[in-house]
């Protein structure tokens, strides 16, 4: 068996031009959760975008590159959750369906969407909730 070659590239996933068309079998990613967390101080970080629709447009650039580089039958695995925003930010409690919006964008690009896998993750609850909310900062019950 031939040895495999691995490269780790630190860059912007909105530009994957260094990868050839149809050269990747699997992409696993967890995009930023819109503006809920400061990931770093890089001004180009898409997690810093305040407008949700503008954020989705930037994510679409990523998905278009991913679609181009995947082999026929290749897979994109996207670990993402919906985004709950507090009343203090929008005057009312809102849930932005990030997972559904990504599915719609990817389907328009040409991806075949499979059923989502729901992960009931509560391990980070102590970081997300200060007032003991039973919903743990998530749009669904634990």
Residue spans for each PLM region:
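Core catalytic lobe of class I
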Residues: 1-142
